[in-house]
Amino acid sequence: MRKTFLAGNWKMHYTSTEASIVAKKIATEVKTLKDDFVIMITPPFTALSKVSECIKGSNILLGAQNMSYMESGARTSEISPSMLLEFGVEYVILGHSECRLYLGETDEIINKKILTGLKHPFKYLILCVGETLNERDSEKTLDVVLNQVKKGLDGVSESDIKRIILAYEPIWAIGTGKTATKEEAEEVHKAIRLEIMKLYSKSVSDNVIIQYGGSVNSSNVKELMNEPDIDGALIGGASLKAESFLSIINNVL
């Protein structure tokens, strides 16, 4: 049975002090978890240190929103794997649509980040994939998404794929209030799982975690999680307040 992964992506919100207050509220409330349930939060880089202290010893994992594919060097504004590990980061989001759009990250760059991350002891790397509204309207969703999956996982071995979480985030649903219907989301998740089977094996595809991201909230999370190929959620705005994030968690538990 696959685990359920709920990850809160705080993007460029909160100072370190603000983030630590929210993190502490979440960690305090989430006292017990089933073995098949994982909760993660990803504050801004500047808040990693304080948040790490706030959730130490709790059931909450600490994540980062991005990472360089270089170990060190002349990369102004970037952050290396070892820098993240120093703060206790256990997973990293890679290939988020906002990084693809605003930072010009290509499938090739994202693949380099995946391969670099696998050389370090992160528990999980989350590979984000998704299509634009124009691509969906042109019936190119599966072509676009599966191509991103293949390019993102290029060179990833079968032994390493167990540390990869895939996150389907339709770009047209991120921060817009629009959400893919459970049927639309399940169709893409099922296609991703079948693609993983082609690339690796049925055993791998049966066990790979695939999250959904795109205006997830307490009202729609339950029906999304009830779909057979949706194993969790990558949550943006609804994870920024402890109350709304906890409501999502309680609706899934």
From Swiss-Prot:
InterPro entries: Aldolase_TIM, TIM_sf, TrioseP_Isoase_bac/euk, Triosephosphate_isomerase, Triosephosphate_isomerase_AS. It catalyses: D-glyceraldehyde 3-phosphate = dihydroxyacetone phosphate. Its EC number is 5.3.1.1. It is found in: Cytoplasm. It holds the Pfam family TIM. It comes from the Bacteria. GO terms for molecular function: triose-phosphate isomerase activity. Keywords: Cytoplasm, Gluconeogenesis, Glycolysis, Isomerase. It is an enzyme of class 5 (isomerase). Substrate binds at residues 9-11, 175, 215, 236-237. The active site is at 96 (electrophile), 169 (proton acceptor). Pathway: Carbohydrate biosynthesis; gluconeogenesis; Carbohydrate degradation; glycolysis; D-glyceraldehyde 3-phosphate from glycerone phosphate: step 1/1. GO terms for biological process: gluconeogenesis; glyceraldehyde-3-phosphate biosynthetic process; glycerol catabolic process; glycolytic process. Its main location: cytoplasm. One of its GO terms (cellular component) is cytosol. Belongs to the triosephosphate isomerase family. Homodimer. Involved in the gluconeogenesis. Catalyzes stereospecifically the conversion of dihydroxyacetone phosphate (DHAP) to D-glyceraldehyde-3-phosphate (G3P). NCBIfam families: tim (TIGR00419). This is Triosephosphate isomerase. The lineage of its organism: Bacteria, Pseudomonadati, Spirochaetota, Spirochaetia, Spirochaetales. The gene is tpiA.
